[in-house]
A protein has these predicted regions:
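Structural detector of well-ordered beta-strand residues that form the stable sheet scaffold
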Residues: 40, 63, 129-131, 155, ...
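C-terminal hydrophobic helical "lid"/dimerization subdomain
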Residues: 118-122, 161, 165-213
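Conserved acidic E/D residue at the C-terminus of a beta-strand in Rossmann-like folds
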Residues: 66-67, 134, 158
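Glycine-rich phosphate/adenylate-binding loop and adjacent beta-alpha elements
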Residues: 1-3
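Glycine-rich cofactor phosphate-binding loops and adjacent beta1-alpha1 units
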Residues: 31, 73, 78-153
Length: 213
């Protein structure tokens, strides 16, 4: 078991954000992200956004990809330098231009969409590292010849491995500002309505926290 003390300056209603932040951090750690590298992140939900902000903290350059324009605009407002709408932009060409032809040394797949999982191979550089943290509902066929040709490393990432202390520190020092990611805080009796609202308007929310009173 892991026991981590919540810093005094992290409000109780924001502390649960540490758990999804550990998922984002673990995905980056699994891919062994380094300063100066380009990190393409597919999925601009809470985990994808925090992966982008954490990559920036590690002095890498994040490129965040999604099909929800509102999430991309919000990420850009928070300082993510490159955002791409997969529904509109020519993502491969755009990343080629951003990276001066090398493509991304690290790719984080945080959407779970089968098509996005397949596309990670095209976004990665030669000898690139791909970290899969999204949960697909079905199997995805991948061209193994491309994996071999580009010498890609594919790594699953589904949990955290000692990242809670780092996550809490980042929340405490506002390297990741919890207010930027928690869209709404509700009481326990408000959860059913919050779930309906989230299901109806997913573009409006990143993370909803429920608290005891």
């Amino acid at each position: 078991t892991f026991n981590s003390k919540i810093p005094d300056n992290v409000p109780s209603e924001m502390a649960p954000l540490a758990e999804p932040l550990t998922i984002a951090l673990h995905a980056l750690h699994r891919a062994n992200v380094k300063a100066g590298e380009y990190v393409a992140i597919i999925g601009a939900g809470a985990i994808g956004l925090m992966a982008a902000l954490s990559a920036r903290h590690y002095k890498a350059t994040p490129i965040l990809i999604d099909i929800v324009e509102e999430r991309l605009r919000y990420a850009q407002k928070l300082g993510v330098p490159y955002v791409l709408n997969a529904a509109d932009d020519q993502v491969i060409d755009a990343i080629k231009n951003i990276t001066h032809g090398t493509m991304a040394q690290v790719v984080i797949e945080a959407s779970g969409a089968n098509s996005a999982i397949r596309n990670t191979l095209d976004l990665a550089s030669f000898a690139g590292r791909i970290s899969f943290t999204g949960w697909p509902k079905q199997e995805t066929s991948l061209p193994t010849n491309l994996i071999t040709y580009k010498e890609l490393d594919l790594r699953g990432s589904r949990t955290s491995a000692g990242e809670f202390d780092e996550a809490l520190r980042m929340l405490s020092t506002l390297e990741i500002n919890p207010q930027d990611v928690v869209s709404k805080v509700v009481n326990l009796d408000e959860i059913p309505d919050a779930v309906k609202e989230l299901d109806r308007y997913p573009e409006r929310y990143l993370k909803i926290n429920a608290v005891f009173h």
